[in-house]
Design a protein with these regions (language model features):
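Extracytoplasmic "Venus flytrap"
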Residues: 1-27, 50-57, 81-84, 154-162, ...
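Solvent-exposed, acidic/polar segments of extracytosolic/periplasmic ligand-binding ectodomains
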Residues: 4, 330-402
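Signal peptide-proximal N-terminal region
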Residues: 4-6, 25-47, 69, 141-143, ...
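Short beta->alpha junction loops
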Residues: 48-57, 123, 180-191
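Short, well-structured alpha-helical segments in soluble
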Residues: 53-75, 138-142, 190-203
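Extracytoplasmic ligand/sensor domains, especially the bilobed periplasmic-binding protein
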Residues: 71-183, 231-256
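Extracellular/periplasmic ligand-binding modules, especially the Venus flytrap/periplasmic-binding
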Residues: 164-166, 213, 218, 265-328
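Extracellular/periplasmic periplasmic-binding protein-like sensory domains
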Residues: 223-297
Length: 402
């Protein structure tokens, strides 16, 4: 075998496809860079990408192809898009000795009883919500609102449930009154007008969202049309920098706080970002500037480090790659907080830090290419940091128990 087959089961045609396509592009460029520099242990890496259309049964079909122990199989999966999708393969991944990096930040992945072979990237929806609500509360107090009220709104399932659970934990710890808890009520593609009406009626000072960029756009524009413009914030998938080019841009500028697990495109002083930009611009000069590349790049960094460790251990089997993940620390060249998975104590190893960014519409360059360079419209406020309430939380499994 002169190649190392690495799999990605990615949403290339479903609700997150615009972002995931860019994430896969970055992984592709990363592995091309690794291969140009001699590969891993003298072998070239072949990235095998299959589309799940953000559909769980399709994801399971794709996994069946990748778990094959013959020539069609892969040694690890460097991206599995979706929380319910990855949950559906989590137990099989243990049976198959396959390491999987999820494109999902469900807090259950850190629990060895559930996500033993799921090697998560960065923090999770729950802790991101705790950090985010703590910042939002502080921000409102700085604006002169001593006891700001909160509404929570999100999707059902592992993603929505986990993000909303973290917001509830933060509200409880900080004594924030939750005037509307609409976690689990927003259905993508459905008529969400009644939910928006409930948000407007509750009239909270701040709203925490665990949505998609499409449903956040509906909610913010729908509420604004009824004269309701609170301070909005939410989990990573709620926001896309591309929204700044649409009707919502001005309201995002004044009324939305962005949370991230990674740095964004224009964050100064990050050595790994300069490497990424140079490689991406050389490989795809006409592609648009995007924060999503950083997600794909860091996924590939973690996979690369594990494969290098497996090669060093002289065990490039699937089990050898799983073992390698449990031995390494990944520093991501400053693109994200340092990460480890081994050691046997998830409360010690779970990443609690996230980043807070301000939306600056003037810094958004719509359609700017990698060759030209440009901004994605966010400026770092704080991070990587964990709120005191997040540091104090004992990790004992997923915040959301569906």
């Amino acid at each position: 075998e002169d190649t190392i087959r690495v799999g990605a089961i990615a949403d290339l045609s479903g609700i997150f496809s615009s972002l995931v396509t860019q994430i896969v592009d970055a992984q592709t460029v990363y592995w091309d860079m690794v291969n140009a520099n001699g590969g891993i242990g003298g072998k070239q890496v072949e990235l095998v990408v299959l589309d799940n259309g953000y559909d769980v049964p399709t994801h399971l079909e794709r996994y069946e192809a990748m778990r094959d122990t013959g020539a069609d199989g892969v040694v690890m999966i460097s991206q599995s898009t979706g929380s319910p999708h990855t949950a559906a393969i989590a137990e099989m991944a243990i049976e198959d000795d396959l390491a999987v990096i999820p494109l999902s930040w469900f807090s259950g992945w850190s629990d060895p009883a559930f996500g033993k072979n799921i090697f998560e990237s960065y923090s999770n929806y729950c802790y991101e919500s705790m950090n985010g609500v703590e910042y939002l509360n502080r921000y409102m107090q700085d604006q002169g609102i001593a006891n700001p009220t909160l509404s929570i709104v999100g999707f059902p399932g592992e993603y929505g449930g986990d993000g909303s659970a973290g917001a509830r934990l933060a509200a409880e710890a900080l004594g924030i009154e939750v005037v509307a808890d609409l976690g689990g009520t927003v259905i993508p593609g459905a008529d969400n007008t009644p939910v928006i009406s409930q948000l407007v009626a509750a009239n909270a000072d701040m709203v925490w969202t665990t949505l998609s960029s499409g449903t956040l756009t509906e909610a913010m524009l729908g509420a604004s049309a009824q004269g309701y413009e609170p301070m909005w914030s939410g989990n990573v998938p709620s926001f896309s920098y591309l929204m700044l080019g649409g009707d919502l841009g001005p309201l995002l500028d004044t009324n939305y706080i962005v949370n991230t697990y990674i740095v964004t495109w224009n964050t100064p002083g990050v050595p790994g970002l300069e490497t990424l930009k140079a490689e991406m611009a050389a490989a795809m000069p006409d592609a648009v500037v995007s924060d999503s590349y950083i997600v794909g790049w860091t996924e590939a960094q973690a996979a690369h480090e594990a494969l290098e460790q497996a090669a060093k251990n002289r065990d490039m089997t699937r089990a050898g790659v799983v073992r390698a993940f449990n031995e390494i620390t990944v520093d991501y060249d400053g693109l994200a907080p340092r990460q480890t998975w081994g050691g046997g104590d998830p409360n010690a190893s779970v990443v609690r830090e996230t980043y807070t960014y301000d939306v600056v519409l003037a810094d958004y360059d719509a359609g700017a290419t990698l060759a030209e360079g440009g901004g994605t419209g966010t400026v770092l406020v704080e991070g990587p940091r964990a709120a005191d309430i997040t540091k104090a939380h004992t990790y004992a499994g997923a915040c959301y128990q569906g």
